């Protein structure tokens, strides 16, 4: 199973993310965007509990930055939505977990949720 995880850059609850990731079997693969907050927390937790992180074919730093980092220098403000599309295209998730307390105030996580729903991918919103 492939699970795309995204979330708030201001997310701080390690416990909530750990609880969610521990629900999945060890053969689960996690797709994430390398952003501060929820993404970095969940990447660290996934590594610590033995869940594989999937990296972008363009990511040449898979040891330190396993995932799909946005190229802000190349794409500017469009980098986030471009990265979100790339995570969906390359990662091919079965499920999306969105860690956000107020999705209506979000730009990045909200964009990922919208793109996922348009593709018919189940989205679970988890609040802090």
Residue ranges of each PLM-predicted region?
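Glycine-rich phosphate-binding "P-loop"
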Residues: 1-13
């Amino acid at each position: 199973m492939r699970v795309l995880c995204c979330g708030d850059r201001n997310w701080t609850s390690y416990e909530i993310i750990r609880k969610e990731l521990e629900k999945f079997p060890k053969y689960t693969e996690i797709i994430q965007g390398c952003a501060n907050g929820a993404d970095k927390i969940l990447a660290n937790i996934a590594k610590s509990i033995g869940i594989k992180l999937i990296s972008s074919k363009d990511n040449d730093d898979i040891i330190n930055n396993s995932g799909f980092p946005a190229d802000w220098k190349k794409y500017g403000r469009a980098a986030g939505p471009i990265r979100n599309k790339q995570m969906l295209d390359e990662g091919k998730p079965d499920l999306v977990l969105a860690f956000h307390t107020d999705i209506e105030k979000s730009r990045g996580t909200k964009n990922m949720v919208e793109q996922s729903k348009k593709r018919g991918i189940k989205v679970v919103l988890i609040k802090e």
